[in-house]
Amino acid sequence: MMKYICLIFCFFALGYMSVEAQTKTALINGTSFTDNEGKVINAHGGGFLKVGNYYYWIGENRKQGVFVSCYRSKDLMNWEFRGDLLTRQSHPELDSANIERPKVIYNLKTKQFVMWMHYEYGRDYSYARAAIATSSDIEKPFTFVKSFRPFGNMSRDCTLYKDQDGSAYFFSSARENYDMMLYKLTDDYTDVKKQIATLWPGGHREAPALVKRGKYYFLMTSGCTGWAPNQAMYAFSKSISGPWSELKNIANSTAFDSQSTFILPLVGNKTTSYLYVGDRWDGKQYFKSGYIFLPLTFENDSTMTLNWRDKISIDVKTGKAK
């Protein structure tokens, strides 16, 4: 009997140890990250949002169709799949749609999570629309609202930003990606209210990612070279509406073979770090694309740098990333 009990104890102990062994203490940059079940994380072109004790990572899932998938984590390294928020079955307008770069913010007035994204219908990029979906629960399926061209402008690569005063803004590439447009959203975040600026007309920039640090907003973008990486650049401004500085190079000539998708502030009890999140695209098999998490550094209030690290360890309690 004692031998039997011992065997049972050993079995559960080994099972516990195997689970513990899977807990990540660092992420290997440039690889396809995996979730807590060992499955590849499909959340490309994604954004992040903290709700309660969890960070949510919402992005493109291209393995079986074109979904918008949701993952959550308490430490930004160990991720749990929570489901698909949008699929081609969610709405008739999505039955042949390609969704890219979904971003989600929360509206305190309407109690809704609001998603904006790049919408295409079919195989090419001729539709060039923005699209919107909403949900009262970040882990539950979103309701598709509409797709449209903001004030008649094309809309491709995009990002969404909620400012400290609750106002929200949408950045997107327009005019065949030659211009970066900036719009202020309506109070419920489900439409554009005003076109604020055309940033760097003719600059041919895409993949916008925005963050505010201190008195300055920083906007990072990439050039337009299809799935091939290129020189990342950034600009800064004391006002989101501008004037914005000239574009400056950051990282190496290929952004370490990645393209920007988000800048995540990591607010801890000792410091605040800012994480660059990029996709390392595989243009032939999108779902095999890798990810890059790197800490941004600031030499002064308006100078931002990005250096390569093979791996990164994140401490959400202290706010340190190294």
Each model region followed by its residue ranges:
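Bacterial Sec-dependent N-terminal signal peptides
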Residues: M1-T23
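Carbohydrate-active catalytic/glycan-binding domains of CAZyme proteins
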Residues: A21-K322
